[in-house]
Amino acid sequence: MKRGGLWLLLGLLVLSACSSNPPAASTQEAPLLGLEAPEAIPGRYIVVYKENADVLPALEALKAALEPGLMQPQGLQAQALRTLGLEGARVDKVYTAALRGVAVEVPDQELARLRQDPRVAYIEADQEVRAFAVQSPATWGLDRIDQRTLPLDGRYTYTATGAGVHAYVVDTGILLSHQEFTGRIGKGYDAITPGGSAQDCNGHGTHVAGTIGGTTYGVAKGVTLHPVRVLDCNGSGSNSSVIAGLDWVTQNHVKPAVINMSLGGGASTALDTAVMNAINAGVTVVVAAGNDNRDACFYSPARVTAAITVGATTSTDYRASFSNYGRCLDLFAPGQSITSAWYTSSTATNTISGTSMATPHVTGAAALYLQWYPTATPSQVASALLYYATPNVVKNAGRYSPNLLLYTPF
């Protein structure tokens, strides 16, 4: 009986609010604010109506119709959306007190139409609000990526942890019992030992995983790490094993997802194609530039345009002497004398160098970004990392290299 009364009230509200069609489009567009803000959420906006706009009854009806668990008469929500000119939007929140408006997800075409509604005062890009955490003291690599300039301040400041994001470490496996990863090891794959657990017997993959998401040494301290073992105990393997690992990830990944490939070899069309297909499946792929002090465009998967290719720097912002360079790079990250987890015990650490060590810094940063923007495409993730990177600080970056150093405001 009470439910029926509520339905009747909703119906009356909507019928009253919908007594006329939305007004004709205005020749003057409503302002669009905050689109360039660092924390802007792609595709999400707050639509604020003018104080004198006759929209409150429709907003109240829509707010009631969206109440969780409330059964509503068919068509009431659609009718309220039509009255407010929101047929093409997905409404997430409705405001009737602090302001009169809605939070919506809309495509660009619908956004343009909303801006022409004369009842709209302005539209603002939705943004993230975050708590802050600081690690002090921090390893130099973490310390470097959260500040624009030297000297280092001994701190790593971060606003996200990568929680809810899945990082696939295509490498030598991971020491599953290491305390850096407690409770955050996800399902893995072993291309070296059929049916194996992807346990690391080399150390390289554990070190990489520690930089991506270790509790002490990691960029993204809450990310879920998936071991994908494609290299043996000597750190060697084949393109066929690497492609097998990529094939498994492409088929079985959980989004939001990022792949780390701190490995490579000579140019390979098959490997490049496997990487591209993983990217086309919606997985961001971060790859090492290589350690031969040569043009990265001669190496796979470093030469894959849609992947994020990473060179290495020293603690003084020089390109590391071993790091590959050139047009196929996207950015640089710390890669010399990096301390992280190791495979010899559950508490072991090691300090090593390479573009393999630079790459997981970027993978961790991608995980931070994906925590806040879980539906971001690989292209959007790459664009964000390049947008925030610090320009023109890498010394001797190498011919045709982009002079960009990883920076993490996330």
Curated annotation (Swiss-Prot):
Disulfide bonds: none annotated. One of its GO terms (cellular component) is extracellular space. Thermostable. It is an enzyme of class 3 (hydrolase). It is found in: Secreted. Residues 45-130 form the Inhibitor I9 domain. PROSITE patterns: SUBTILASE, SUBTILASE_ASP, SUBTILASE_HIS, SUBTILASE_SER. It holds the Pfam family Inhibitor_I9. Keywords: Disulfide bond, Glycoprotein, Hydrolase, Protease, Secreted, Serine protease, Signal. Residues 139-410 form the Peptidase S8 domain. Gene3D superfamilies: Peptidase S8 propeptide/proteinase inhibitor I9, Peptidase S8/S53 domain. Its main location: secreted. Transmembrane segments: none annotated. Its EC number is 3.4.21.-. This is Extracellular serine proteinase. It comes from Thermus sp. (strain Rt41A).
